[in-house]
């Protein structure tokens, strides 16, 4: 007797109270610092044009400096201390007692899908929860940006008769740090000197400033934007703003963008792309300080989905409701150097250091505490200096 496997029926219908398309567009490693001000329109004209009709956040800060812990924060609304996914050698799983973003949309009746090649957001980490469909291929084996964009457009067209939630990811910016071959369309715009590779074999989190990699990074972003333009055009040709909720967000910046001598958690590493367009989204550019933990409550609020606000660390920013974030946690948990600093926002910034006892017992490593000085608040962070002790 042959075994048969059946999936859930796919309802071909649109219901009031839902969007026809909700898209979480994860751009791994897209640093806000390189697309500030006029540089945004210069490097990413298609993305600028699309999201200028919505909300662009210029002061979104990542809770962690690399993908594994940071992405877990985005999808769970929990900071690293609460989801405990931080160790580069010990695999973890999203807390089962805390619903993920995808589970909230599934509960609302959306047809939920995930298409990406991120090896730090795989099913065994809990990212398959709430999904009707999961299409996973390693980035270098079928999920590169040019392939992913076309696959997403085909997917959206295929399931056009449903109210669909789709999580997609593009991770090719890591190719710069990893020293992999870039697209021919990128390489032809680089000089021979810029194509020379340095710090090969060093994990991207720990890389030092590199003018060559910075040039490669910016050229890759321009190439990405050209590809993203196909997706934006498809969306605008098939939906109105009242029918969609589109977000583009990132998990961390890049170490090789930080000038020599600046602190580890500089804005080039911590500030990330964060933007939204669609129903309930204001047309604005905001410099309100936002955490990546806020991504879950923002998406749920914009989609009119109830969520358990008391059980997560993410909050709704003031530009959406009358609320003001009191602090942001910027964490470096890259073993063996682990520290956490909490930036207190009111008045002159204060800092709080917490010993990560649970992580120490689990990882069997040591703790290096890094002290931050000279916190200055002029409605946003202007500079941040670091000194060890």
Regions found by a protein language model. Give the residues of each.
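Catalytic domains that recognize anionic headgroups
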Residues: 1-389
């Amino acid at each position: 007797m042959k075994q048969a496997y059946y999936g859930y029926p796919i309802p071909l219908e649109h219901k009031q109270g839902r969007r026809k398309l909700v898209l979480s567009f994860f751009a791994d490693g897209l640093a806000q610092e390189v697309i500030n001000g006029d540089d945004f329109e210069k490097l990413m004209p298609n993305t600028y044009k699309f999201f200028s009709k919505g909300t662009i956040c210029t002061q979104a800060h990542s809770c962690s400096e690399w993908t594994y812990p940071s992405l877990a924060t985005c999808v769970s609304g929990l900071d690293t201390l609460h989801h405990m996914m931080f160790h580069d050698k010990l695999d973890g799983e999203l807390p089962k007692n805390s619903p993920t973003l995808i589970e909230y949309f599934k509960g609302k009746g959306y047809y939920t899908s995930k298409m990406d090649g991120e090896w730090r957001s795989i099913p065994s980490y809990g990212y398959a929860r709430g999904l009707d469909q999961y299409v996973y291929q390693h980035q270098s084996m079928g999920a590169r940006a040019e392939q992913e964009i076309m696959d997403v457009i085909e997917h959206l067209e295929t399931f056009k008769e449903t109210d669909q939630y789709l999580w997609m990811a593009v991770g090719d910016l890591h190719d710069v740090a990893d020293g992999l071959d870039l697209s021919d369309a990128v390489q032809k715009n680089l000089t021979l000197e810029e194509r020379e590779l340095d710090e090969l074999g060093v994990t991207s989190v720990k890389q030092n400033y590199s003018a060559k990699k910075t040039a490669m990074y910016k050229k890759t972003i321009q190439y990405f934007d050209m590809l993203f333009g196909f997706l934006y055009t498809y969306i605008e040709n098939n939906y109105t703003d009242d029918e969609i909720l589109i977000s583009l967000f990132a998990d961390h910046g890049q170490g090789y963008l930080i000038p020599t001598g600046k602190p580890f958690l500089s804005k080039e590493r911590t500030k990330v792309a964060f933007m939204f367009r669609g129903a309930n989204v204001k047309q604005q550019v905001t410099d309100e300080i936002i955490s990546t933990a806020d991504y879950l409550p923002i998406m749920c609020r914009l989609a009119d989905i109830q969520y358990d606000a008391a059980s997560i660390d993410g909050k709704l920013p003031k530009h959406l409701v009358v609320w003001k974030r009191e602090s942001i946690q910027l964490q470096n948990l890259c073993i063996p150097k682990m520290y956490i600093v909490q930036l207190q926002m009111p008045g002159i910034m204060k800092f709080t250091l917490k010993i990560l006892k649970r992580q120490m017992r689990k990882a069997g490593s040591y703790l290096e505490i890094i002290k931050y000085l000279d916190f200055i608040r002029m409605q946003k962070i202007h500079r941040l200096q670091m000194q060890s002790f």
